[in-house]
Amino acid sequence: MKTSQFLSLLLLAGIAQAIVPPREPRPPTGGGNKLLTYKECVPRATISPRSTSLAWINSDEDGQYISQSDDGALILQNIVTNTNKTLVAADKVPKGYYDYWFKPDLSAVLWATNYTKQYRHSYFANYFILDIEKGSLTPLSQDQAGDIQYAQWSPMDNSIAYVRGNDLYIWNNGKTKRITENGGPDIFNGVPDWVYEEEIFGDRFALWFSPDGEYLAYLRFNETGVPTYTIPYYKNKQKIAPAYPRELEIRYPKVSAKNPTVQFHLLNIASSQETTIPVTAFPENDLVIGEVAWLSSGHDSVAYRAFNRVQDREKIVSVKVESKESKVIRERDGTDGWIDNLLSMSYIGDVNGKEYYVDISDASGWAHIYLYPVDGGKEIALTTGEWEVVAILKVDTKKKLIYFTSTKYHSTTRHVYSVSYDTKVMTPLVNDKEAAYYTASFSAKGGYYILSYQGPNVPYQELYSTKDSKKPLKTITSNDALLEKLKEYKLPKVSFFEIKLPSGETLNVKQRLPPNFNPHKKYPVLFTPYGGPGAQEVSQAWNSLDFKSYITSDPELEYVTWTVDNRGTGYKGRKFRSAVAKRLGFLEPQDQVFAAKELLKNRWADKDHIGIWGWSYGGFLTAKTLETDSGVFTFGISTAPVSDFRLYDSMYTERYMKTVELNADGYSETAVHKVDGFKNLKGHYLIQHGTGDDNVHFQNAAVLSNTLMNGGVTADKLTTQWFTDSDHGIRYDMDSTYQYKQLAKMVYDQKQRKPERPPMHQWSKRVLAALFGERAEE
């Protein structure tokens, strides 16, 4: 096994002993004797770091943010001077509110109440406007009934754009103007449908005010003809189950099915004049709009990012608002893989007499920051190298600086940098010569930032001025209590390293060893991959003391866990990512098997007890890994797995696999269809799935279990567990409690399992032999 020297951070001196990063002059603390318990780790970690997230306010005084006092009042505070002012008294705060947003001039608050969850990001609510000076509370709509889908303040005046019944409205000083009249079950104005919310925007809105507040760009989605998927809810949150389940019908486009069509619209707020802008970048049935961004400080120009259906070609189209003229200002062919929708376009303004916007692109093979001319032309690279920019944190147009996080040190790390788009000088804001994981949150005017150290040691947060990144102004979150708590425990020993594939690529590995690890003993091992395209599980972020830490710590279990990021995962360059294009489930299980064989070079690894467990894509990867019939893995658990990507949504799947018409053989191979690997397991295979899963439908588990049963996988090898009405997270009605107890029992039983096959009743042998042949007698 090849181990990278700089990454062999055996956190014996780190997490295991709760080292404080070198910012504080205190020595490492000693470990205790307590071991993590089930209740402390499951269903979610109870011993965990705290963090502070601030709602920065753009005002004349930089460093201001909104906080809430113990009695519920909303306070305007300055993080630097510690001065504060009560904006909303506690008795003016609506009871049971869900969220709130201040008007930009701080004269009013928009409240969301009566929250009802819809999908992953979207919800319905009532909205009220509080006039701070008058103390009056006014409903956004007089007849609202917890049915408003989204609402947003204009950046400049007293207007609110909101969506109700899939129609767009503009509220201004108590008067409401209905903008669209066609909203309904199939037409969405200003909010995304299910597939755009889940796979494209990752959010609940599809409208964008111009910086001067005079125009609104929005998208209209038409789901007419998109196939419907029906989800039954058997209990439907009732004490007594209804005789007929409630049925939720979702327009859910699966692979090669009809997608929703999308239109681009502009609204003049003052005149209420609405204009449909023709989108000609791709044909209507071959179009995905992935991003909208204003490319001006007023409302001169707005752009949208258009993809073809399978998202391997893109065009950035600029629209001149006054003339309504459209122009392709940038395009790219990414048919060597796919093009990620990073939602990173931001207007910069004038640079040496020409207007630019900033964006992230991996066209060079690595994701980097570029300046692009607003009217098209040659781009300017601001960062380069065989590492990746992860996210743009802040654009400071006055200082001509862009703040961002990157993997420059290593793909598992994150460090914060600035780059000048005037001089192209790149400057670290942290010590970028250590394996660490940072991010930052910048004040509205960019004068201050909260630096968040997120691992691998005990996290903390500090306030800095952008004028001096060497000396913190104050500590925001110390996590001293966590540090003291950890002194009581012996924690899993965590290390990071790389293993090298025969083809030359390296895979990142995170290893957890039991607290009382003895290299002369034998230990069962559980692999815990996710492994999906562009994802990352192996990082230097804080090691959550969750279920994986529990099974490592429990004296009756003492599992070693390995998390391996296979080919196709993120932050190691485009070539590494794109290797899985058109063949999901082919390379990923090969890499997991290779890693397991490398693991078995360790004398302490028990070859008879090597398991693999994954959720969602990880559940799919678990099944595909067992399907290889490698003989390395002896048991597996798939939670909420995809079993055949022809059953999953179009916009995610086709990005990586293309359509069935273009890649029929690829889809056939990607589906879990070979059963010998499951039949030959020394141990057991468990499938868990929620029947109310609106993302990865229960259909996947049903099809998978049927495939395995009909293929001859015997009852001593296979268990299927459904969770009534639970969604993809399996959280309905205490389901997660049962789920994790089942997981704990599974890994315990598998550790206790003897290598030889358990005895069977004679009638079982005869029945199995009749059904599946003499193999059942073996």
Swiss-Prot record:
Glycans are attached at residues 84, 114, 222. Residues 1-18 form the signal peptide. GO terms for biological process: proteolysis. PROSITE patterns: PRO_ENDOPEP_SER. Its main location: secreted. Keywords: Aminopeptidase, Glycoprotein, Hydrolase, Protease, Secreted, Serine protease, Signal, Virulence. It is an enzyme of class 3 (hydrolase). InterPro entries: AB_hydrolase_fold, Pept_S9_AS, Peptidase_S9_cat, Peptidase_S9B_N, Serine_Prot_S9B/DPPIV. The keyword Secreted applies. It catalyses: Release of an N-terminal dipeptide, Xaa-Yaa-|-Zaa-, from a polypeptide, preferentially when Yaa is Pro, provided Zaa is neither Pro nor hydroxyproline. The active site is at residues 616, 693, 728. One of its GO terms (molecular function) is serine-type endopeptidase activity. Its EC number is 3.4.14.5. This is Probable dipeptidyl peptidase 4. It comes from Arthroderma benhamiae (strain ATCC MYA-4681 / CBS 112371).
